[in-house]
Structure formats: structure tokens, C-alpha cells
Amino acid sequence: MIISSSTDYREAARRRLPPFLFHYIDGGAYSEHTMRRNIDDLADLALRQRVLKSVGTVDISTTLFDEELAMPVVLAPVGLTGMYARRGEVQAARAAEKKGIPLTLSTVSVCPIEEVQAASNRPIWFQLYVLRDRGFMKNALERAWAAGIRKLVFTVDMPVPGARYRDAHSGMSGPNASLRRIIQAVMHPTWAIDVGLLGKPHDLGNVSAYRQQKTNLADYVGWLGENFDPSIGWKDLEWIRDFWKGPMIIKGILDPEDAKDAVRFGADGIIVSNHGGRQLDGVLSSARALPAIAAAVKGDLTILADSGIRSGLDVVRMIAQGADGVLIGRAFVYALAAAGQAGVENLLDLFAKEMRVAMTLTGARSIAEISPDSLVRGL
């Protein structure tokens, strides 16, 4: 099929993947209103086209946490990425390195920290959840630092897992889930051979390394779900701030008061995020939450944003709203599932091209020149 956008990669991924995997990455919480608003609210932000602004060259590079990026895009942490392509986290890390940006490795990746970092000459970022098992958290941090990772993304919007109705219907969970997944795999032989057989081991690499025993999909649902800690507060995170010597980025901020708390805590950055609409349905989209947060803490720390970003135009929109950069999750996983490393590389090329076109037509020659004036106000 012809690939010209992330939407095309989504369709290609749908064709290739067993339904339980496609709907796991494609779905959101409850009735998925917030997931849809993430996309729609970004699309509703009208770019302000300008003409004759002498935009001879456009520079989309930027610097985040003293790290130079070819464009203000980071691959977001996505659990089970290694189930979407053979050793998927490794392929994603290589694609990101080739295009001059970092991958953020999920706590619950299939490939462990050491395997992924060894595959890339560029230091990846690492994402960690707040978990009851502090021993696991400390072990993961120590291993990440030893591997050369210096950027920590700390996810705080998951004290309990969100209810994702699609998972029960698709076979990720629900009655006879294991049998349903096997049947689906048999009906998708290309994936079954390439990933199901040749992509083993299919365990949670970082969890297995800590527990010194193999893990599986049941552990992803069981062990992880049992370890989320709703009692956590900012004070409980102080040991991590003291332990981790590199930049620490708090992921899951939707309210200006929480952003101010992150500043007081000493975070180096925040990620304005609703977990892609996968946690609490009915909350603000990231695009709508971002302006008030930027007004509250811009200049005090680095502001990143995710959720709903499907194109380079969306990147420009988020930056115009006050973000310093963005993370993309679903979009790159669709591309990875459809075409592996080459798919992610092509997707990032599409994002870069779309950014350059949008910046040229709004009169911005650099990331620094993207501002609220790049959008039409009052709409």
C-alpha cells in the first residue's frame, strides 16, 4: 500500500498485527473520548499562514537537556514494543539514532535496557513507573545508569491502571484470552513467524533481569498491575531525585498546580500528557492543557508534550502552544509494526518534511521562532 502519513502506517499495522496487539496500541480508556480529543483538539488549532517572510532556510534542530536533536521529537516509552516487530525496541532505537533523536525505553519493554542501549551509539532515555517494589525501581535505575543512560522519564499518572474496554474484546484480557491470542496469531502468519517465532524471548526484559526468572504477558497484566502504588506522593520521590544524577522528567502532568509542584520538587522537565487517553477518560486533551501549564512554569523547566501527535504539523502546533518538544508513541509503533526500523525512519522523515513545510508557510525559520503567533487566535 502507499504510505504517505502516520494514518497509512496505522492501516498497515492493522493488517499485519493480530487484533489483540493492534487494539492494545490503538485503543484508549473507557469510551475513548479523551483519546479522540487528543487528535481532534490538535487538528482544530489553525496555523497562521504568512507570506513573503523571506524563509530561505528552515532549521528544525533543537537542544533538550543539553542534548542536540535533529528535530524536537522523542520516541515515547511504549510497553511491549518488542511484540510489534522482531526485537522492536532495538529496531526503534536504531531508527531514532539514525534520524538524530532519542528513544525512550519503557519499564515494561520486551528487550532489556542493556540489549537496547548496546544496539545504539546514541544514549537512549529510560522511563520508570512508581511501583510498590522499590527494589525493582532501584535495580532498574542502577542498570540504566551503568548502561550509559542519563535521561530519566518518571511516569506519575498511573497509580492505578486505566480501564481499557477494547482489551477485553480483542483478547489482550478477558475470557479465554490466551486461546484467543493463539488463534489470532495463527491467522496472521507473517507476524507469527517474524515476531512470534523469530523475535523471542517474549518476556518483560527488565522485570526478568530483576526477578532472575522468565516473565510473560500474564506478568505484564498481573505483576505490573499489583505493583502500581496509589499512595505515592512527591515526598516519596525524593530518594529518586537524590539517587539519579541526570535530568529527571516528570511524565503525566495535566494541571498547572502539578506543574508548579514539579518545579518545587526539582524536576528538570515535565511531559504534558494524559497517557494517550489510556488512563482516565474525560480529562483534558494535552493540546488544551498545555497553554495554562506553559503560562505557569515556562522558563522554570523544560516542557514536553505528547498524546495525539500524528504529524509534523502537530509538532509545530504543540510548540506554538508552549512546548519545547514532543514525544510520539502510537505513530512510531504503527510504523514499526508495518515496516520495522525502515518504517520508523520513514515516518520521522515525513514528520521532518511536514515540520519544514509548516514552518515555511507560517514564517518560522527555527524552532525558536515558533510562537503563539504561529496560530490563529480566537478560534
Curated annotation (Swiss-Prot):
UniProt binding sites for substrate: 24, 129, 164, 278
Gene Ontology CC, one term: plasma membrane
Main location: membrane
PROSITE patterns: FMN_HYDROXY_ACID_DH_1, FMN_HYDROXY_ACID_DH_2
Any Gene Ontology biological process: aerobic respiration
Reported cofactor(s): FMN
Residues at the catalytic site: 275
Name this polypeptide is given: L-lactate dehydrogenase
Organism: Allorhizobium ampelinum (strain ATCC BAA-846 / DSM 112012 / S4) (Agrobacterium vitis (strain S4))
